[in-house]
Amino acid sequence: MPRLYLLRHAKARWAEPGVKDYDRGLDASGKADAEQLGIDMLEAGYVPNLVLCSGAKRARDTWNAIAQHVEADDVRFLEGLYSSDAAGYLDIIRESDSTGSVLVVGHNPMMEDLAVALSREGEEQALSAVRRGFPACGLAVIRFSTALAEIAPEDGYLEAFLKPHSL
């Protein structure tokens, strides 16, 4: 059964004069959270075959911190994950041609909207947590009984929702 991992980038630095939103990196707590998430993903067996990562610096930095602990067969940086809505994210996932599990590193509100839309059922604690909000460096783990190319809203089972300070 393939898994879809939806990861909101870790906590970014505040905007600085002359720095575009796209170019904001992680702050110290964001780096630490992402590194810890990489450790916890490895320990839980949450290892993707494919990573689809927003091209924004904070998303790339998040993946790079996780990648110190978790390896993927293929990593793609996609500009569409910076500006798309949840429906656009779903199209990108379907079109990825992945036969295994996929990690998407992106942004809110798209992550939260997509996690809620895909997860009709799941572990109560995970469902409750994701409905309360999707924090920076939050990770939704959604399991499907079909290939990711065929997923549709309410097809998934939310098996876990990891967030900083509770990992």
Range-by-range predicted roles:
Residues 59-61, 86, 111-112:
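Short, well-ordered alpha-helical microsegments
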Residues 11, 56, 109, 146, ...:
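Short, glycine/serine-rich, charged loops/turns that create anion-binding
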Residues 2-81, 120, 134:
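Active-site-proximal alpha-helix that buttresses catalytic centers in soluble enzyme cores
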Residues 119, 123-157:
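Domain-level recognition of soluble alpha/beta enzyme cores
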Residues 64-104:
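Helix-adjacent hinge/juxtasegments
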Residues 156-167:
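Short, solvent-exposed aromatic-acidic interface loops
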Residues 4, 101-103, 139:
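Residue-level preference for the first positions of well-ordered beta-strands
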